[in-house]
């Protein structure tokens, strides 16, 4: 995984995270927990979207990325 893309849509109240090129999206699967998984043709999860996600107007959205040791 070379690049991680995170999109926050305040108006649409969604947080979308892509693990790879979003043009590879083939199908979406709703999990029932207000989370949608985006998958490629091989069924691999390439991203997810959290529905009804919001950050209070007074707060900043900060994203921290940590990697696990090999």
What are these regions (language model features)?
Residues 1-70:
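Small, basic N-terminal interaction modules of short regulatory proteins
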């Amino acid at each position: 995984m070379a690049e991680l893309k995170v999109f926050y849509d305040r108006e649409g109240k969604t947080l979308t995270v892509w693990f790879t090129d979003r043009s590879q999206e083939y199908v979406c699967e709703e999990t029932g927990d207000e989370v949608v998984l985006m998958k490629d043709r091989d069924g691999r999860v390439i991203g997810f979207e959290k529905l009804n996600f919001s950050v209070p107007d007074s707060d900043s959205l900060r994203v921290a990325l940590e990697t696990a040791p090999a």
